[in-house]
Amino acid sequence: MLKYWEVENYTRISAYDGREDDLSDILKGRYPDMMSSSEVGCTTSHLKAMKEFLKTDAPCALMMEDDCDISTASYWGFTWKDFYAKIPYDYDVIQLAIINPAQVYAQLHRRFVNDFSTACYLITRHHAEKLVRLHCKGEKYKLDQGAKPRAVADDLIYNSGNTFAIPLFLYKLELGSSIHDIHIDVFHKSSYEGIWQFWKAQSQEVDNWDPYFNYDPYFGRIPPGFEGK
């Protein structure tokens, strides 16, 4: 897929596999609470990729897992440069692939707590530096500091910075999930079908994409019970 889009400036990083190894040998401190070894493998793999990113002088990096599907770009009515020019100046992370068990919001928005997936995101250098400083200790990783709600990749990366989300890309259902395979039919599939429906049908009727890239700073941030007052 990267070859098709003529993407040449990329680096593949081998991941940690926690399916048959609890990975305690790469951790410093206590084993993180309420996390499976597969989740530990996912989090540490992303931190490993950030360390590689910081060896360059790039101001930001586009992180993709092997199940990321960028074929939605065929239906875009804009270019990557068009989108990048509209990104909030103070962002730390832009989540670009979303699994939401309730509803996926197509407009750029401050990430909801149930916007799951680290299949693809854009991260700034300064946020990667922060995460590496907090969680990388030499060749080992420290995940026992009490990240809320857990130190899984979504929470660790997104909740620690100014994170926005927009479903520009998808994820490949046929590859399953090495972390929560039971969620494929329940959460992944419904989000997948909704996002594909948007890109294949609704997006073709959009003449001006600026409203989709202009986030509402108040959306989803009003205290419970305050609505309508």
For each feature predicted by the language model, list its residue ranges:
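An acidic/histidine-cluster motif and surrounding catalytic segment
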Residues: 1-64, 68-229
